[in-house]
């Protein structure tokens, strides 16, 4: 119990830092817009599959990672300064984004893919989980080439790397066809004190790689792969004691592969 309290306090501190960073960036953005008139804006949408690495399934099992999946959909807004910050404008973009993610989860791997009919195996097979996540965050993108080339007749292919910080509101649900989670009949001993249906807020950090492809003047497609590390291990509804179960070595994290469309205007 003391361990979970310490982890919760640590998560809350990290969440406050994430919120503070987002507010500072938003404040700087609004101040810059008020001071300078020469900037252009972009709006876009994105969607794609997301794969959640959680406490469901055997650690390191590829099937577990690929099948505990869902989808993500969202919108984003870019602000790029054109005239007043030439060094920044040629290499960086600043993106505000909001998204919705839904993932369904089960246990996969060697502990359920066997002929055993033990209580532990049956309990694992009967467990299911679902989590939905609403995310708001910021992302800074670095372009090796000029970010506005595709609007000036330059290369239509513009790759980038990015880093970001987000605030996530999640709702997790853990169920079993054997009965109520938390009872000995339905719950493996590993999850007796480490499974719950709950709602919460957690910060996250992300790293992305992607590219823009111009399809017409002021129109582009975006292809992006993002890894997102949550500052909580409760996003999936499971969090076995990592002092006892050494395989629980990290918080929940996800990989998303998205396709988006962006429209540019002054």
Which residue stretches match the model-derived regions?
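Residues on the lipid-exposed face of transmembrane beta-strands in outer-membrane beta-barrel proteins
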Residues: 45-49, 73-79, 138-142, 163-167, ...
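Short loop/turn motifs that connect adjacent beta-strands in outer-membrane beta-barrel proteins
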Residues: 34-39, 80-92, 146-157, 215-219, ...
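Bacterial Sec-dependent N-terminal signal peptides
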Residues: 1-39, 46, 263-265
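Transmembrane beta-strands of outer-membrane beta-barrel pores
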Residues: 47-53, 98-104, 144, 165-171, ...
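Short glycine/proline- and aromatic-enriched beta-strand/turn motifs that initiate or cap beta-hairpins
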Residues: 34-83, 262-266
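Residue-level detector of the transmembrane beta-barrel scaffold of outer-membrane proteins
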Residues: 42-44, 93-95, 160-162, 220-222, ...
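Predominantly the C-terminal beta-signal and adjacent terminal strand-loop region
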Residues: 38, 54-56, 207-266
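Extracellular/periplasm-exposed beta-strand and loop segments of Gram-negative cell-envelope proteins
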Residues: 56-66, 103-135, 169-202, 234-256
């Amino acid at each position: 119990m003391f361990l979970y309290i310490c982890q919760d306090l640590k998560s809350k501190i990290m969440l406050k830092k994430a919120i503070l960073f987002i507010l500072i960036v938003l404040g700087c953005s609004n101040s810059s817009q008020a001071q300078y008139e020469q900037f252009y804006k972009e709006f876009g949408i994105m969607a794609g599959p997301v794969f959640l690495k959680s406490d469901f399934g055997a650690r390191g099992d590829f099937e577990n990672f690929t099948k505990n999946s869902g989808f993500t959909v969202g919108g984003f807004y870019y602000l790029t300064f054109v005239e007043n910050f030439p060094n920044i404008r040629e290499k960086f973009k600043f993106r505000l984004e909001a998204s919705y993610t839904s993932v369904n989860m089960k246990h996969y791997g060697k502990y359920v893919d066997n002929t055993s009919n033990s209580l532990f195996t049956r309990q694992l097979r009967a467990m299911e989980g679902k989590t939905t996540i609403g995310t708001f965050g910021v992302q800074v993108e670095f372009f090796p080439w000029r970010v506005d080339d595709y609007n000036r007749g330059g290369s239509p292919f513009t790759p980038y790397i990015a880093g970001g910080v987000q605030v996530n509101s999640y709702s997790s649900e853990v169920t079993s066809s054997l009965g109520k989670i938390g009872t000995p009949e339905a719950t493996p001993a590993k999850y007796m004190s480490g499974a719950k249906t709950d709602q919460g807020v957690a910060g996250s950090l992300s790293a992305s790689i992607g590219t823009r492809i111009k399809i017409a003047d002021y129109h582009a497609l975006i292809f992006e792969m993002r890894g997102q590390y949550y500052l909580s291990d409760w996003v999936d509804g499971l969090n076995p004691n990592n002092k006892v179960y050494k395989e629980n070595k990290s918080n929940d994290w996800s990989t998303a592969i998205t396709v988006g469309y962006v429209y540019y205007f002054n």
